[in-house]
Amino acid sequence: MSYQRRHSRWYERVLFSPPSLFFLGAMLAVCLPALERWGWGFWEYFDAVRVNTLGGAFVAFLLTGIVLYRFLRYPGASPVAYMIPTVTTLYGSLVGALFFLRLPYSRQVLFESYVVALLCCWVVYFIGRRYRTPKYALLPFGDYQPLMHHTCVEWRLLDKPDLGAVRYDAVVADLRDDDLAGEWERFLARCALAHIPVYHIKQISETLTGRVKIDHLHENQLGSLLPSPIYAFIKRGMDILAAVIAIPLFSPLMLATAVLIKLESPGPVMFLQNRVGKGNRDFRIYKFRSMCQNSEQHGAQFAQDGDMRVTRVGKVIRKLRIDELPQFFNVLKGDMSLIGPRPEQRTFVDQFDREIPFYMYRHIVRPGISGWAQVVHGYAADADDTRIKIEHDFYYIKNFSLWLDVLIVFKTIRTILTGFGAR
C-alpha cells in the first residue's frame, strides 16, 4: 500500500509552504501601504522616497518571516509570544538606519507597513495553529510514553505496521529497540520511500523538550555537539561590541545600585568569586553583592527561595538581574559571553563531574550572562535540577547558532520582566 505525506498535494504545498506565505505577506506589507499613500500608479514613478521606503519595508518583512520561522525550530518558542517584539525591533531598526544614513522615506507608509506586517503574522499564526499542528505516527516500542504528554503534537499510536488512509507529517520510532524488526522495519522503509520522514525518538524528544539526554552519550553524538568555530568567532565580535555599548549605557544604573548596596548593609559593593569557564579554566566573576557579608563563610551552597542571606536591595537586583550587569566586564575580558551556560563554582563543578556523565563537556563554550537553561528551566537548586540544567546546556551547544542566541535574548527580556527563576 502506498502512503502519502500530509500536505503533500500541490495546492497544499503552495498554500502552506513558508516561501509562498513569505512572498504573499511581503507583497501585502509593501503594496497596500503604497496604494493607500500614492494610488494605483505608484509603480510608474520611483523616486528616492519610494525606493527607500518600499525596499526597506520589503527587507524588514522578509527578515521578520525568517526570524519567526527560525524560532519555530526551538521548543517553547511560540510565534505569538515573539511576534510583536520581532516586528517592532526590525521595523524600528529600519527607521533608525534610514534616519542615521539621512535617507528620505515616508513615515506614514512604513507605519502602515508595520501594521500590515503584524496582521499578516497573526493570520499566518492562526492558519498554522489550525492546519499545521504536527501529526506524528508513533510506533509502540521503546520509551515512547513520555512523548505523548506533549500536547503541541497530535500523536497517533500505531497498533500495526500500516498508516491506512491517514496522512502524517512524520513517523517516530525508537530505532534501537530490539523489538523493532520484520514487518515494522519494512513498514519504515515504505514510509521513507513515500517521502514521509522517519525520526528517531530521541531526536523528537530533544526538539520538544529543549534537552539533550546525557546518560548515554556516544562518541558520534559528542561529535555533533561540537560548536561551529565560524559562529564562535562571529559571536565573540558581537560580544565585544555589545559590552562596549552596554557598559557606558548602564553606568548610571550600576552607580545607583552600588550606592544603595553600600547604604543598606556593611561590606563591599562587589561580590568577586572564582568560577569555571571555557576549557575548564578558572576566572573571577564580577557581581553586585546581593547577600549579607560573609554569606558563604561555611562553604558554597545553593540559593533557595526566601533565602535569609539575601538583602532587601539584593532581592530587587536579583529579580531584575541587575546584580549581573558587572559581568559585561567579564565579557569584555573574554571570560564570558552574553549567551551561554551559566558558570559554576569549582566546588560544584568537581561534585557534578563525579555525579553527572560528560558534565565537563559544557565547558567547550564560554559561559554566559544568560543562557538557554536559565530562560527555560530557571535556577538550579540541587543536583537533580542541575542535571536537567546540564541537559539544556547540551541542547544549546548542539544547536549553537545566531537564531538560538536571538531567541534567548528575547526570552531573557521576558525573564527580567516576570522575575522567572530568581532566588
Swiss-Prot record:
The record's catalysed reaction(s) read:
di-trans,octa-cis-undecaprenyl phosphate + UDP-N-acetyl-alpha-D-galactosamine = N-acetyl-alpha-D-galactosaminyl-di-trans,octa-cis-undecaprenyl diphosphate + UMP
Task: Supply the enzyme class, top level.
Answer: transferase
Give the protein's recorded name.
UDP-N-acetylgalactosamine-undecaprenyl-phosphate N-acetylgalactosaminephosphotransferase
**Chief location category:** membrane
A GO CC annotation recorded here is:
membrane
Q: Which family does it belong to?
A: Belongs to the bacterial sugar transferase family.
- What's in the keyword line of the UniProt record? Lipopolysaccharide biosynthesis, Membrane, Transferase, Transmembrane, Transmembrane helix
Q: Which GO terms describe its biological process?
A: O antigen biosynthetic process
Enzyme nomenclature, EC number: 2.7.8.40
Question: What role does it play?
Answer: Transfers N-acetyl-galactosamine (GalNAc) to undecaprenyl phosphate, a step in the assembly of the repeating-unit of the O-antigen. Shows no activity with UDP-N-acetyl-alpha-D-glucosamine.
